[in-house]
C-alpha cells in the first residue's frame, strides 16, 4: 500500500444536510407567483401600536407597572421583569386567551423594542415568572394601578356597578367548583366578582373566587374594601346591581353608610302578590321604552324595614315560544297563541333608596346593560375567558392584568374617537392591526404602515390627531410629572364626559 495515499475512514460521515429553501412558486388564477420568505425583516403585524406605546410612556403607566411589580429573580439567566410584563401586555392587547398564543409574538421585531424590551419571552417563562410573585403582594400591586387609572375621575358624579360572571373550567384547577353556571350547568367554574365604573366601562376591581362562591356574601368584602380605599368624599352617587345584590345585608349596610342604591328584585311570592294587586289599577306611569311603572312600599321576608319598590311591566307584542321540558332528553317547542282579547306582559321589580321619578329609575336600571356588555367584551374579546392555570393565584394575577390593560386601551381609543368607545372587536382591526416595516437611515427610524382595513383613512386621521395632542403635551408640559400628564390625557380623552372641564391634579409638594 502506498503510504502517500490518505487512509480511508471506516465510518463514512453519511449524507450532507440538505440546504433549506426559502422560496417557492404557486400557480394562481392570476398566473405564476414566486413566493419568498424573509426571516430577518423588521416587521410587525401590530403596526399602529407605537402611538399607544407613547401614550403609556407619557402617562407613566407601563414604567410604573413594571417598577412596582413584586417579582424578583435570583438566577442571572432569568428574563428581565420588563421583558416578562411586556410580553403579557402584547399578548393581552393581541386578544390572546391562552399562554400558548404567546408564541405568535415572536415574529414581532418592532414593538418589543419600542417598549424597551430586549426580547419576547416564552410562554413557560411567563408562567414561571407569575408563579414567583407573592399572591398578596401581586394583588395589591395590580389594585394600586387599577386605582391609578380611575382615581382622577372619582371626584365626578359616578355610578358603581357590581356584578359577577362565571368562567367555565375544563380541568383539575384549584377552585374549580360546581356552582351557579347558567350556560353550562354542572360544569366547574371560577366566579369573577367585579366592580365597574358605569358609562366609562372601567374596571375598578376584580376578585376571582371558586365557582361555588358566587353569592353576594362572597363579594361584599371586596365591595366595602373598595369603598373604604377610595374614601368617603369620592363615593359613587349610586350603587347598582342585579337581582343577586338586592338582599338585606347589602341594602342595610348601604343605608347605614348613606349610600344610594338601585337593585332588581327577585319575583318572589310577595312581590308577585303586590304585582297582582297593582295590575287591577290604572294609574301606571310611563317608565320609558314601552315600560310602565308603579311604586309601592314592601317589607319582604328577611328585610329589616319597609323599602320603596318600583313595579315595572311591558306588553309583549311579539310571538312567544314555549319550551316543555317534561322530557329533558326531548324538549318540546310550541308557539303560544294569544287571542284578540288577551294580553301578555313582561314584569320586573326594582328596590331603591332614591327619590327619583319612575321614568328616571327605569332608565337608570336599563343603563346597567352596559355592564353586561363589558363582561361580554372582557370574556370573549380579551383574556377573562382563558389564561387558566392549575393554581388560583396566577388566574387572579392574569384577571387583574387583563382588567388593567383593558382600562388602558379603553381610555386610549377615546382619544381616537371622543364621542364613542368601540369594543375591541372593532378597535383592534382599525387602530392596532396593520403591517409595518421599520427602516433606519441617517440615524432616523421610520415605520411604514400598510393597513388592510376598509376604513383605514379613519385610523390615519385619528392617529394624526392623537400624535398632534401628544406632541403638544411633550412641548408644553415638559415640567409636568407623569401624574399631571395623566390628568391632561384623561381630560382630553373624556372631554365629552367631563363636558370640556379639565381635571385638576393633586398639588405637588413645594421643594425646600
Please identify what each model-predicted range represents.
Residues 236-246:
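Acidic/histidine-rich, metal-coordinating catalytic segments
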Residues 251-260:
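Short, surface-exposed basic-aromatic patches at helix termini and helix-loop junctions that form
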Residues 1-187, 192-232, 436-512:
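Dynamic "connector" segments at or just before major functional cores
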Residues 19, 23, 410-440:
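Conserved nucleotidyltransferase catalytic core and NTase-mimicking acidic/glycine-rich helix/loop elements
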Residues 43, 74-83, 340-341, 389-398:
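Structural motif
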